[in-house]
A protein has these predicted regions:
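Acidic two-metal-ion nuclease catalytic site recognized across multiple nuclease folds
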Residues: 2-30, 191-267
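A contiguous, basic/glycine-rich beta-loop/short-helix subdomain that forms a polymer-engagement track
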Residues: 436-470, 480, 485-487, 615-759, ...
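Conserved RecA-like P-loop NTPase helicase motor core
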Residues: 746, 758-769, 821-924
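Conserved pre-motif I regulatory segment
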Residues: 264-312
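Signature of the SF2 helicase/ATPase Hel1-core->accessory helical subdomain module
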Residues: 350, 442-471, 476-614, 714-730
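Conserved non-catalytic scaffold segment of RNase H-like nuclease domains
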Residues: 2-143, 156-177
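A substrate-engagement module of RecA-like helicase motors
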Residues: 250-251, 256, 270-278, 336-338, ...
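Acidic, Mg2+-coordinating catalytic module of metal-dependent nucleases/exonucleases
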Residues: 115-135, 156-229
Length: 964
């Protein structure tokens, strides 16, 4: 493997050249004491979880310089049988371990071998947890060095830090998923890592070795030794950033506002791109032209030419991303402008960034430049990183502070070898590290007060590079935050694709909400601190010996006093919110109460206003006193109050948001309060949400955009775009400025998808009869399909009740049924569902859309209840107050679109087939039921008595299996 192929895209050439010589230099370079008497270790186990699995092999080697001078290898006899998949992975059989020592005996022998020396392991937390779970394991060593984390510091630009990847790249012994072979590989990689550390900027090793000396950190001796090889070197982050940015230059772009019309390919040229042997065929040799895809590409091309908008519903299989990428790329290249693509999901963004755009760039003469742009909190703040590395700020994590030091080292190395980039791929343990210590928000950015602003900053550098790229890929969240920030986050992009557009109204409402949160307020006041902690304390220490300190300290004392009063006052507000939350009806875990006329006229609200007004007054006093301190100090020592200025703006925002909600007269908003019923305290919030997102988009965003392509597989209700056009404001800007297009899927839904309506399920208000009938449908469906069933619930209570009834019956039948329990990871549930072909899942909102499981993994989707918003939902209540027939205009089409999204989980490829079961009796008892059925991708459905569903599914399954 070539180094060029092993590093991340955009790696500077000087870094590639350095990495290319590491293996040779590792053969001759010496590192004295830090490679004498160190132990390299690896283990094999029966599984990943230390709670449920055991050791089956331990291997270790003692290093002295470049030589292995002693070995330790043993199988371990587990109490359980080795799973078949582990045997397949490792080749370790039950016969191999039958006569092996017990875990206690093996670990005791290991402890004798190690003799307290430092232990190196790749992902050391895993090996250490298994070793120390055995009696006597804690005696093996006090010093464990994780070579995985160290590799991220030493080689931050590698595309992967897996041991097998690095061993192959640097010509070390190969990895075979056996402990002894992995140890041999790591022995070679270890020396490469030491050499790579010496290539980092001069003085960095000393900076890392010296930071926060009170924190025990296993890497400190390594960095200290390497620093001693180059004594007296002083590290400059600013100079390191300047070095890495030398070659980072880009051409200026034209603002599309300056162009009277775009130069675009003809319709015939676009058609040729999708023809056999054309551009797309060169990207994908097995590509077959699709009429629907060509029609969409032509529609996108025409929209760009005319400067108008399009709403395109493209069914599954159309290939919509390639349909818009080609004309948008041509628009960017031919006009020297930047175009934008906004997605909802990371999966689609990754598909564009790492697959489709690179392939497209390879086939276009002159290439194509593209980049991803994320929110501020995805990028490291160099000012905060510098202060943390110098020990100028406290480590705020409540977990192991050593993880924070490791994060500093990883990020510092990365920014010294990367012109751009973000935190998401660095492998930092954010559960143990306080992310805000390393990031900033747009409203908190110090800008001109920051020594790295603008060119050396990764946040502003990313924005600058985006402004010079042909194509920018971002997400819906950042797009709408940019609208709220009046264009200060994204470069001026006038041509957009909004993919996965069915969800943008909801996302815009979330991004534009004004929130007063107990948890965020607590963090805010913790950051402000007081006489001994937080930003106020830091300012006092920084100013204690400066000229004018008497004035400054007096202002600090006043700010500390007013902040303490404000903290207590806002806590009283959240106590009042919790009391008001008792009035909320419905809601299993969370109460969501509309702050409407009835509540505002109640005695409870008038009592609550006393604490609310007191808090507003206290917050305003605190805001004034903190701002006075910031202004006074900033005139002389602006760098001292940068952090305090950031927090001061948050304090002002908190006061303004509380005033807005308590006043409640701005008719653009709906007001509500939220309480977590499972907590005695904490989790309370008050929210103001924009009601009419379409109006806001029509006045604040669409006038700035020449062309917006809204694309999704789920936009129409009974073949009408009316609901979507209203939701995004296209019906407010003139009919001539936009048009809509529906493109059928290229898949045969009528043959491959069956829709079953269980019309005899009792009314859910008769809860026991309803649950009993639904239980029978669920059991029969799971048994008939042999698993691979996804059941999508609208509320947790029904889901958990039915899970306790259905799961034991599935277990007796040998079928696995999982449930989206509280605090469970949606990603792990997805992975489990996909990796176990016969497993089934009961799930909530996170699985209604964006969940792809093709083939036999998913054969049946069950929707027990239509996903109407709750009648007590604050937005629904506000709409009902303001409009007649609000339910039919908003709640009904939104529910239809959610059902369409859920149905879309079934057919993800041309060979997929499956059954959608709708078990809500309202589909046949209410007139609106037809809207759901006529909006589905297949026009036919079967109404079947619930007792016959199991038999129908057996016949359906047999018929489709014969077809295969």
């Amino acid at each position: 493997m070539l180094i060029e192929d092993a590093v991340s895209s955009g790696t500077p050439q000087f870094v590639i050249d350095s990495y290319a010589t590491l293996a040779e230099r590792a053969k001759t370079q010496s590192f004295g004491l830090i490679e004498e008497d160190v132990i390299v270790l690896d283990t094999e186990t029966t599984g990943l979880s230390v709670q449920d699995n055991e050791l089956i092999e331990i291997s270790a080697a003692r290093l002295s310089g470049r030589e292995i001078v002693d070995r330790f290898d043993t199988f371990v006899h587990p109490k359980q049988l080795i799973p078949a998949e582990i045997t397949e992975l490792t080749s370790i059989t039950n016969a191999d371990v039958a006569d092996a020592p017990s875990a206690v005996e093996a670990v005791a022998a290991l402890a004798d071998f190690v003799g307290g020396c430092p232990v190196i392991a790749h992902n050391a937390t895993f090996d250490r947890s298994f070793i120390e779970s055995v009696k006597g394991g804690v005696n093996v060593s006090d010093i464990w060095i994780d070579s995985l984390a160290l590799s991220r510091i030493a080689l931050p630009r590698l595309a992967s830090h897996k041991l097998s990847f690095m061993a192959d790249l640097f010509g070390c012994d190969s990895v075979s998923h056996r402990a002894n072979a992995d140890v041999d590989a790591l022995c070679g990689v270890w020396r490469v890592l030491l050499v790579a550390l010496t290539d980092l900027p001069q003085g960095l090793m000393a900076r890392l070795a010296d930071m926060h000396p009170d924190v025990p950190w296993s890497y400190r001796p390594i960095f200290s030794f390497l620093a001693g090889q180059n004594p007296g070197s002083i590290f400059s982050l600013s100079a390191a950033r300047a070095d890495v940015l030398k070659a980072d230059r880009a051409d200026d772009r034209v603002d599309a506002d300056e162009l009277p019309v775009l130069k675009m390919p003809s319709r015939e040229e676009i058609e040729a791109d999708y023809a056999p042997g054309g551009l797309v065929n060169r990207m994908y040799p097995t590509y077959e032209p699709r009429d629907e895809q060509i029609a969409m590409a032509l529609e996108v091309r025409d929209a760009l030419v005319t400067g108008t908008h399009r709403v395109i519903e493209a069914g599954t299989g159309v290939g919509k991303s390639m349909a818009y990428l080609v004309p948008f790329a041509e628009a960017a290249r031919r006009n020297n402008i930047t175009v934008g693509i906004a997605t909802k999901s990371n999966n689609l963004a990754d598909q564009l960034m790492y697959h489709e755009l690179p392939k497209l760039a390879e086939q276009l003469d002159g290439g194509l430049s593209f980049c991803a742009l994320k929110g501020y909190d995805h990028y490291p703040c160099l000012r905060k990183l510098e202060r943390m590395s110098r020990g100028q700020v406290e480590i705020t994590t409540k977990r192991d502070p050593a993880d924070t030091l490791t994060a500093v080292a990883v990020i510092m190395a990365y920014v010294c070898q990367s012109a751009d980039g973000d935190l998401d791929s660095l492998g930092i343990r954010w559960r143990s590290v306080n992310r805000p210590d390393f990031t900033t928000a747009s409203r908190e950015c110090a800008c001109r007060l920051c020594p790295f602003f603008p060119d050396k900053c990764l946040v502003h550098g990313a924005r600058r590079r985006a402004a010079h790229a042909d194509v920018v890929v971002t997400n819906h969240s950042l797009l709408f935050r940019n609208v709220a920030a009046e264009g200060r986050i994204l470069p001026p992009i006038r041509h957009w694709v909004i993919d996965e557009a069915h969800s943008i109204e909801r996302e815009a409402r979330r991004q534009w909400a004004r929130v007063v949160s107990a948890d965020e307020s607590r963090v805010l006041f913790e950051r402000l601190g007081g006489s001994s902690t937080g930003a106020l304390s830091q300012v006092s220490r920084d100013l204690a010996t400066s000229e004018g300190s008497t004035l400054y300290l007096g202002l600090t004392a006043k700010a500390t006093s007013t902040v303490a009063r404000a903290s207590m006052a806002i806590a009283d507000v959240f106590d009042g919110v919790r009391e008001l939350g008792r009035r909320a009806r419905g809601g299993y875990d969370n109460a969501n109460l509309w702050i409407g006329p009835e509540l505002r006229e109640s005695d409870d609200w008038h009592d609550f206003l006393q604490s609310a007004y007191a808090a507003i007054d206290a917050l305003e006093q605190a805001d004034k006193s903190v701002d006075a301190l910031v202004q006074a100090v900033a005139a002389d020592k602006p760098e001292v109050v940068v952090d305090l200025g950031d927090i001061s703006r948050r304090l002002h925002e908190l006061a303004e948001n509380l005033k807005l909600i308590i006043d409640g007269t701005d008719e653009h908003y709906v007001y509500s309060l939220q309480v977590n019923r499972r907590l005695r305290a904490g989790g309370e919030s008050m929210t103001a949400e924009r009601i009419d997102i379409g109006e806001a988009l029509a006045t604040e965003w669409l006038p700035e955009v020449h062309t917006a392509i809204f694309a999704s597989a789920t936009m129409t209700v009974s073949k009408s775009f009316e609901h979507f056009n209203h939701a995004v404001g296209l019906d407010r800007i003139g009919a001539s400025t936009s048009s809509s297009l529906h493109l059928d899927s290229s898949y045969d839904f009528d043959s491959n998808m069956a829709v079953v309506v269980a019309g005899d399920i009792p009314d859910p208000r008769d809860r026991e009869s309803y649950l009993t009938a639904l239980e029978r449908v669920l059991v029969d469906a799971h048994l008939a399909m042999g698993g691979s069933v996804l059941t999508l619930f609208t509320n947790r209570r029904d889901m958990e009740d039915l899970y306790t009834r259905v799961e034991p019956k599935m277990a007796r039948a040998g079928l696995e049924l999982n449930c989206q329990q509280r605090n469970s990871s949606p990603r792990r549930l997805r992975d489990r569902f996909i990796n176990e072909p016969t497993s089934s899942l009961f799930a909530l909102k996170a699985f209604w859309e964006g969940f792809d499981a093709s083939g036999e993994t998913l054969r049946c989707v069950i929707i027990p209840k239509l996903p109407f918003s709750s009648p007590t939902d604050p937005l629904s209540c506000e709409r009902n107050l303001r409009e007649d027939r609000a339910w039919a205009r908003y709640s009904l089409p939104e529910a239809v679109l959610e059902v369409k999204q859920a149905a879309g989980r079934l057919i993800r490829s041309s060979t997929d087939c499956g059954v959608l079961i709708l078990a809500d009796p309202r589909l046949v008892t209410k007139g609106y039921g037809k809207k759901f059925l006529t909006s589905l991708p297949t026009s036919s459905y079967q109404r079947i008595e619930s007792a016959q569903i199991g038999h129908y599914l057996q016949l359906w399954r047999a018929r489709h299996e014969r077809r295969r």
